[in-house]
Amino acid sequence: MSKLKIAFLSYRSDPFSGGQGIYLKNLCEALVKRNHDITIFSGEPLPDVPHSIRLIKVETPGYFETFSFKERFKIFKEKNKTRMEYFDFLKTSTGIFTEPIFFGERLVLNEVFTKEAHTFDIFHDNQSLSNYPEVINKRLATTLHHPIHVDRDIDLDNEKDFF
């Protein structure tokens, strides 16, 4: 098998909880063992990966690091007020989990990504709901870890009757 240059895109990659960061770490380590060149573009929290995997931080606001409106507003006030920042903050304020939605827009603002996007053989989107530019879409694979509607149906099927 020929060596591929693969970019993993992950809006958050917590190395210790949830499945995304753990899945990302394990898959990337396995691909490096097969001699592929791996770069991860991730928002915080960042994954805990060996130095053989290149890790590029994508700036994200961190609104979901707190559930306090006051703290979220403090984060927003410190941001450069772009159209995206206003939309992100307003949608977050209404309870929408915006990180996977706006990650693609934040990614294309990343200097390393902008400079190197054309050099990757394939992009692997790890659970985002982003609209990506054409440079990505033609070479994109996506992993959806657990569709929320499936989780809901499983939960409801396993609930005892309310009455």
State each model region's role.
Residues 21, 49-54, 66-71, 135-138, ...:
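Short aromatic-enriched loop/helix-cap "lid" or pocket-rim segments at secondary-structure transitions
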Residues 41-106, 110:
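A conserved catalytic-core segment of Leloir-type glycosyltransferases
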Residues 98-137:
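Extended amphipathic secondary-structure runs
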Residues 25-29, 112, 132-134, 156, ...:
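Short amphipathic alpha-helical segments and helix-helix/interface helices
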